[in-house]
Amino acid sequence: MLYLGIDQHARQITISLRDENGDVLMARQVSTRPTKINEYFQKLTRERLRNGESFVAVLEVCGFNDWLIRMLKDYRCHKVILIQPVERNRQKTDRRDAAALSELLWVNRGRLLAGKPVRGLRQVDI
């Protein structure tokens, strides 16, 4: 199982991908243009996921991420976790946000995958 933190904006998403040990495998920004984002997730599926393996994604709730939530299912996303946006601070960056989201997901993976609640997180079945 892989753990994907996504910080989403209108023109790009910033991604932090962790493995089962919590190590960051990939941190990058991807355009939200359909060709670019589909290219990225095709490559992720092809190069990072073994047969039958899937990933779990976490992203902040926003008014324009419904298309992304639906699209993740096409690329073997097992579950999507939504979180309320974190308070803004001076050292907030897209990369830090994506890394913090993937870490939050990885730290709570046992409870989340067992379907148990985690305060502040809402699971979405896709």
Regions found by a protein language model. Name each.
Residues 1-126:
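Phosphate- and other anionic-substrate recognition elements at nucleic-acid/protein interfaces
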